[in-house]
Amino acid sequence: DGQDIIEKEGYIKVDEKAEAYKAGDAKGKVVVMGSSSVGPVMEKLAEAYQKTNKNITVEVQVSDSTTGINSATEGVCDIGMASRELKDEETEKGVKATEIAKDGIAVIVNNDNDLEELSSDQVKSIFTGDITDWEDVTK
């Protein structure tokens, strides 16, 4: 069910052998907050969940990963959405991640740049701020 929705939405399944969800007698409202890149697939998952569980309302609020994690930690929402790994200080607060999908990301470098390729570690260092100058990439 859920993994099929994830694949249909263009993400990569993380559990080929996941069992189909079986409806229960859940009632009430579930608030999900966080990552704008997870939001669209979470909307589809919420729709499917609500069809199976008629007495549940799922509200998806899109912002960013940090807001989703903090909101879940602080009890503002029931589930936080994140499109990044948890930071040490987040896991120290007891936050646990459950991966639901993988997504592809492309990094485009201007044609005038002499750099011919970037490793995953270099991209990570650029986005975490460890590398702030192109000259440092080639070292």
Question: Positions of the model-derived regions?
Answer:
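Flexible loop/hinge segments at secondary-structure junctions
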Residues: 1-139
